[in-house]
Amino acid sequence: MKKIVFTGGGTVGHVTLNLLLMPKFIEDGWEVHYIGDKRGIEHQEILKSGLDVTFHSIATGKLRRYFSWQNMLDVFKVCWGIVQSLFIMLRLRPQTLFSKGGFVSVPPVIAARVSGVPVFIHESDLSMGLANKIAYKFATKMYSTFEQASSLSKVEHVGAVTKVSDQKNPEPDELVDIQSHFNHKLPTVLFVGGSAGARVFNQLVTDHKKELTERYNIINLTGDSSLNELSQNLFRVDYVTDLYQPLMELADIVVTRGGANTIFELLAIAKLHVIVPLGREASRGDQLENAAYFVKKGYAEDLQESDLTLDSLEEKLSHLLSHKEDYQAKMKASKELKSLADFYQLLKKDLS
């Protein structure tokens, strides 16, 4: 039986594509393994999925671009993670390793290359994260969502592989209940803050609940179960799975962070959106780049977190609603998306 090892973690964005690809390989008779951190979100998501995947936990250390005494300890963790991954590779003898990035992926990528296992990696953002910059040196091939520099000879630009589609599905019973609390004459605004929610969105909704629910139906994915609420024109929930796409479809506008996975999901269904990217003080600046790219393409509006107020947000919402056809036409004309089936066929071809 052929074997494939997946790796990637730290955030949902570094796990999502793996979760979409693994069932395809399982259906085709592959034995699927995953290397990650048992305390990480990658382990939680695989357990939730119920997929027949063997999980191998390794030591991980965070890759920092700045000086920290923790870097000294983390160097040892990364080295130990490489040793652990090498033993896993030598024991399994897989045909290939697929990495979605994140600091947990570096040891398995290095170990795979050392043990002669072909390495395929995927980069979602406009600029490579530090983990993938390291991984690229050991990779057989990298697939990218955005165009990359021509000097990166191992990169193939494939566009975004998204987990949502424009196919309409039957409404879940829970969605019917949510809609019964909404005023159908008002536009519906969905706040999406990534896998852990976004404190700034949660605070805005909390501080301006009265004003917002007078003018909009509000859906707030919070990442915090203490905020859960279903009331007149308001639905707040910590986390959703099956409801994710139905809520996307229900919304007239989405207010989101600038993670590549989410904004390309919105592009795939031509959904109006305002991007509030994480700034450089909280990230490496990838979300700022993603947001600027989407604004330049005419797909979205952006708003810096430091400028986010009720008034500034409503100005953006009003602009999007009044120019809905223009934004949707540009999104529908985009050539930057690839279906999961097409990407899987491309990957299988490269593995053969």
Swiss-Prot record:
Transmembrane segments: none annotated. GO terms for biological process: carbohydrate metabolic process; cell division; cell wall organization; lipid glycosylation; peptidoglycan biosynthetic process; regulation of cell shape. It catalyses: Mur2Ac(oyl-L-Ala-gamma-D-Glu-L-Lys-D-Ala-D-Ala)-di-trans,octa-cis-undecaprenyl diphosphate + UDP-N-acetyl-alpha-D-glucosamine = beta-D-GlcNAc-(1->4)-Mur2Ac(oyl-L-Ala-gamma-D-Glu-L-Lys-D-Ala-D-Ala)-di-trans,octa-cis-undecaprenyl diphosphate + UDP + H(+). It is a peripheral membrane protein. InterPro entries: GlcNAc_MurG (IPR006009), Glyco_trans_28_C (IPR007235), GlycoTrans_28_N (IPR004276). One of its GO terms (molecular function) is undecaprenyldiphospho-muramoylpentapeptide beta-N-acetylglucosaminyltransferase activity. Keywords: Cell cycle, Cell division, Cell membrane, Cell shape, Cell wall biogenesis/degradation, Glycosyltransferase, Membrane, Peptidoglycan synthesis, Transferase. It is found in: Cell membrane. It is an enzyme of class 2 (transferase). UDP-N-acetyl-alpha-D-glucosamine binds at S195, Q287. One of its GO terms (cellular component) is plasma membrane. Its EC number is 2.4.1.227. Pathway: Cell wall biogenesis; peptidoglycan biosynthesis. The keyword Thylakoid does not apply. Cell wall formation. Catalyzes the transfer of a GlcNAc subunit on undecaprenyl-pyrophosphoryl-MurNAc-pentapeptide (lipid intermediate I) to form undecaprenyl-pyrophosphoryl-MurNAc-(pentapeptide)GlcNAc (lipid intermediate II). Belongs to the glycosyltransferase 28 family. MurG subfamily. HAMAP family: MurG. This is UDP-N-acetylglucosamine--N-acetylmuramyl-(pentapeptide) pyrophosphoryl-undecaprenol N-acetylglucosamine transferase.
